[in-house]
């Protein structure tokens, strides 16, 4: 089994190939939001690093959101096209789950019970979830178990719900990751009790295809696969123009064609 994973939902694009043994081969961009021009190059690099050809890929996975609307569309469309061309199934991976998995090692090392991936959705809004960082029964494998729903939260709402949960377990620590830290660190610091939170380093904070690949391999082994036309984006909310159109507040000059 050789799974290609695509990540385009955040600042930086990346692609990874994972094999049956869990070995991951990755390529990533250092240019912000250059997904459209750079993704095919990154895929080629990751496949080459894995020492295979595209024809040897058995699955194509995409980080389906939430995140940048444009980035999500690029990633999902690229995965669909490759799946159709190669005749292999697709795998959908939650961006928030992939972020939690990426942070898992550091979170456990920091003594954190909860991993909190937070994506900035602007105006105090976030896309977020809360995961419990646990070891499996053999104490050799780590898992991120969802304990709060992945959805759109106001940052204050997220912290209030998280605080209520943490109060049930005295001395627990939350490990925050994602670009929501960049936007809302002051609010988090003023709301959370001292010593009850840790921020991910910038080197770990943003989305990357490696964790998408690890989740995708597990899903492939479990048979959680899709046809190319079943792979769908997860925006978690309508684009601003779509919200305004639905609410009837979009300008008539935008909604209706101008007669010439």
Give the label of every model feature segment:
Residues 61-95:
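DPxDG-like acidic metal-binding loop motif
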Residues 34, 89-206, 258:
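Surface "functional belts" at beta-alpha junctions
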Residues 20-21, 76-86, 134-136, 192-194:
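A glycine- and small-aliphatic-rich helix-loop capping segment at beta-alpha/alpha-beta transitions
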Residues 1-64, 206, 260:
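N-terminal beta-alpha supersecondary unit
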Residues 16-18, 127-131, 234:
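Conserved hydrophobic/aromatic positions in well-ordered beta-strands
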Residues 49-56, 83-93, 108-111:
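Phosphate-handling active-site elements
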Residues 198-260:
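Acyltransferase
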């Amino acid at each position: 089994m050789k799974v290609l994973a695509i990540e385009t939902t955040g600042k930086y694009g990346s692609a990874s190939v994972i094999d049956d043994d869990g070995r991951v081969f990755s390529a990533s961009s250092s240019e912000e939001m250059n997904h459209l021009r750079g993704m095919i190059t990154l895929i080629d690099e990751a496949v080459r690093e894995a020492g295979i050809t595209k024809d040897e890929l058995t699955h194509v996975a995409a980080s389906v959101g939430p995140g940048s609307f444009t980035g999500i569309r690029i990633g999902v469309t690229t995965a669909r096209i490759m799946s159709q061309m190669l005749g292999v199934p697709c795998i959908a991976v939650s961006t928030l789950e992939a972020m939690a998995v990426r942070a898992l090692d550091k979170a456990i090392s920091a003594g954190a019970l909860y991993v909190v991936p937070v994506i900035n959705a602007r105006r105090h809004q976030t896309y977020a979830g809360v995961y419990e960082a646990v070891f499996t029964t053999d104490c050799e494998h780590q898992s991120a178990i969802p304990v709060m729903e992945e959805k759109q939260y106001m940052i204050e709402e997220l912290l209030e719900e998280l605080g209520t949960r943490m109060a049930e377990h005295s001395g627990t620590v939350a490990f925050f990751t994602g670009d929501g830290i960049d936007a809302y660190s002051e609010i988090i610091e003023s709301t959370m009790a001292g010593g009850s939170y840790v921020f991910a380093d910038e080197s770990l904070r943003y989305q990357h295809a490696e964790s998408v690949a690890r989740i995708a391999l597990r899903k492939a082994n479990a048979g959680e696969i899709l046809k190319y036309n079943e792979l769908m984006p997860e925006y978690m909310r309508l684009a601003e123009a779509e919200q305004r159109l639905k609410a009837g507040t979009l300008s008539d000059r935008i909604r209706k064609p101008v007669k010439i």
